[in-house]
Amino acid sequence: DFIHARSEKEIIYTRNTSESLNLVARSYGETHLKAGDHILITIAEHHSNLVTWQRVAQKTGATLDYIYVDKETGHFPEEELKKIDDPRVKLFAFAEVSNVLGIDFDPKPLIQRAHAHGAIVVLDGAQSTPHKPVDVQDLDCDFFAFSGHKMCSMGGIGVLYGKEELLNDMEPFLMGGDMIEDVHEQETTYAELPAKFEAGTQYVEGAVSLVAAIRYIQAIGFDEIRAQEKRLVTRCLEGMKKLPFIHIIGPTDPEEKEGLVAFEVEGVHPHDVAQILSAEGICIRTGHHCAQPLHIYLGINASCRASFYFYNTEEEVDYFLEKLKDVRKVMGYDD
């Protein structure tokens, strides 16, 4: 009931979002796409939803196209969204929320638009599922992937949702025990869904921890989670705007940010920023955040990212901002 699938047959346990997307790419993309078809993704994708489709394009002869964000706002211009209307697009894959820009791309209208022109839609929910309610039936996406470790469960557990009729039409991604019905010397029949895609001994501990995390999140409620995250992001952005050496990546309006803020510190490499903050007990992410093409497109070598969840406090945000002021001082700047 967490993402409102129609049946448990539509829920497949994987290791993470990356494996879920690879499953779709291998079991659907490589067998259902061909030369002349187009795969459409966005420049804002995590590598798991980009490199996978590069490979499918290379193996099938399909063409890989991109929707580009506006470099100033981070949103998709209508001129770029018109690419969805191309009838040659047979598969459209994109993230509901960017893990760099922090933007919720409002997937439902994009899904409807893609379906109107005959495309299958793969939605990466890794950055959205921990922070907002998800209803795959209302969204009407064909596939939806997310990870447990981003929402308080143990690592190594993920989920792929797929419409039952599509999953039934796909070959298994992995072969082995438990995904079979009958095995003979020259042929095998496969088990019913979801076991068909769950070969071998499953990570039971991870699945149990994911269920516990879901129940915990549901007990708190997404209204409270979103309200707390909005308070934290607002406080962070307001503080950063007062620091002239900080460049915020993507929108600076907290209403357009979902639980994270990516930024640059003028004159200081992101890895140095992380090292200095780490010495003060603050953990941030630095580098490309598995979104190198987006950084290249934006003309950014690398960036820092501060992520917030409901367990963070406004006092922690204030501490982070205070220590951020010290970063350039440590590097010898006199601000």
Regions found by a protein language model. Give the residues of each.
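Pyridoxal 5′-phosphate
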Residues: D1-D335
